[in-house]
């Protein structure tokens, strides 16, 4: 069911719980093909790329069931979410094509917003929003796609700005939620994985623009943080 009270934004009510990855659960990076420019800085794999793809396909299926037949507007939070977003909408389009059910509306309309609240691995506490006029989302079903829910600050602040224009509903899709004491308790509605509080790279996650091209989600080494910290 697509309808959801705006005041429930960020509470995760009625969601299917994410795949829980226990603390200290890793794969040895030597068991994977790691590009030479990444190898010195990655020694632990948290989420293999194949697992990520399969999990995103399941999220797309859940989203399809929720919004089928409705006009869905999906907002990609740039640029960290681009990889997750592209994979998600590819699966959404494929699922609708072969679902066997006819719909008079496209599976989604895509939009892009640039938000920035991090430098190095720390939230600055200040949110910068670069986007078109948010009023286009008035009376629309909106799904915000973010790569990770960490402190929750970014999506809380952006959510407040979006609420002001009066969307019909607002939900969050994210690949990863961190279990961290720094969280403001914001929860996503469609969540791939629940992980411990470690800094991750790969599969579109970066550290100051490095490692986005790595195919797996890995834990960033101390050596990488020292070398690439700005």
Curated annotation (Swiss-Prot):
What EC number(s) are associated with this protein in UniProt? 2.4.2.22, 2.4.2.8
Q: For binding GMP, which residues are annotated in this chain's numbering?
A: 79, 146-154, 178, 199-200, 206
Annotated pathway: Purine metabolism; GMP biosynthesis via salvage pathway; GMP from guanine: step 1/1; Purine metabolism; IMP biosynthesis via salvage pathway; IMP from hypoxanthine: step 1/1; Purine metabolism; XMP biosynthesis via salvage pathway; XMP from xanthine: step 1/1
Q: Which cofactor does it need?
A: Mg(2+)
Q: Name one GO cellular component term.
A: cytosol
Top-level taxon: Eukaryota
MF term (GO), any:
hypoxanthine phosphoribosyltransferase activity
Where does this chain mainly localize? cytoplasm
Q: Which reaction does it catalyse?
A: IMP + diphosphate = hypoxanthine + 5-phospho-alpha-D-ribose 1-diphosphate; GMP + diphosphate = guanine + 5-phospho-alpha-D-ribose 1-diphosphate; XMP + diphosphate = xanthine + 5-phospho-alpha-D-ribose 1-diphosphate
What Gene3D superfamilies does the record point to? 3.40.50.2020
Cross-referenced SUPFAM superfamilies: PRTase-like
Gene Ontology BP terms: GMP salvage; guanine salvage; hypoxanthine metabolic process; IMP salvage; purine ribonucleoside salvage; XMP salvage
How does it associate, per the subunit comment?
Homodimer at low ionic strength and homotetramer at high ionic strength.
Please explain the role this protein plays, according to its UniProt record. Catalyzes the transfer of a ribosyl phosphate group from 5-phosphoribose 1-diphosphate to the N(9) of hypoxanthine, guanine or xanthine, leading to IMP, GMP and XMP, respectively. Plays a central role in the generation of purine nucleotides through the purine salvage pathway.
User: Which PANTHER family does the annotation name?
Assistant: HYPOXANTHINE PHOSPHORIBOSYLTRANSFERASE (PTHR43340:SF1), HYPOXANTHINE-GUANINE PHOSPHORIBOSYLTRANSFERASE (PTHR43340)
Its recorded name reads: Hypoxanthine-guanine-xanthine phosphoribosyltransferase
Organism annotation: Toxoplasma gondii
In the UniProt record, the gene name given for this protein reads HPRT
